[in-house]
Swiss-Prot record:
Family: Belongs to the gastrin/cholecystokinin family.
Tissue specificity as recorded in UniProt: Highly concentrated in the duodenum. Also localized in more distal parts of the small intestine.
A Gene Ontology molecular function term of the record: neuropeptide hormone activity
Sequence positions bearing Phenylalanine amide: 118
Gene expressing this chain: CCK
Location, primary (coarse class): secreted
Residue ranges the record assigns to the propeptide: 21-48, 122-130
Post-translational modification: The precursor is cleaved by proteases to produce a number of active cholecystokinins.
InterPro entries listed in its UniProt record: CCK-like, Gastrin/CCK, Gastrin/cholecystokinin_CS
Keywords assigned: Amidation, Cleavage on pair of basic residues, Hormone, Secreted, Signal, Sulfation
Protein name according to UniProt: Cholecystokinin
Sulfotyrosine PTM sites in chain numbering: 112, 126, 128
Pfam hit, one: Gastrin
Length: 130
């Protein structure tokens, strides 16, 4: 996995450096290539130039900055209120479930939220004589 990532990074660096050398040294005394590249850049400029249909009209903007600030303030107040209450939802329910585990449980030291060890649990259920 690590070697695959290294190879991808190496190929990306190699292609970027070869692309940079190709554009910088593409003319090499060839006037036809220089002329072609210049005409392409001019064509690109013409395509991107604004149309001569007339001056652009500014888009009318609604003054929603006051409403937006009030909305952000309300959301911030709601968040702070919930943060002061403490954990809610799924996390608090899972915390109650973890506390209700029987203390004589064989593997109670490994029972915590979000953790499963299938191999050890199945191995401990069956007593293997080796």
């Amino acid at each position: 996995m690590y070697s695959g990532i290294c190879i991808c990074v190496f190929l990306a660096v190699l292609s970027a450096s070869s692309f940079g050398q190709q554009t910088a040294g593409s003319h090499n005394g060839n006037p036809l290539a220089a002329e072609l590249e210049q005409s392409l850049t001019e064509h690109h400029r013409h395509v991107r130039a604004p149309s001569s249909a007339g001056p652009l009209k500014p888009v009318p903007r609604l003054d929603g900055s006051i409403d937006q600030r009030a909305n952000i303030g309300a959301l911030l107040a709601k968040y702070l209120q919930q943060a002061r209450k403490g954990p809610t939802g799924r996390i608090s329910v899972m915390g109650n479930r973890v506390q209700s585990i029987d203390p004589t449980h064989r593997i109670n030291d490994r029972d915590y939220m979000g953790w499963m060890d299938f191999g050890r649990r199945s191995a401990e259920e069956y007593e293997y004589s080796s």
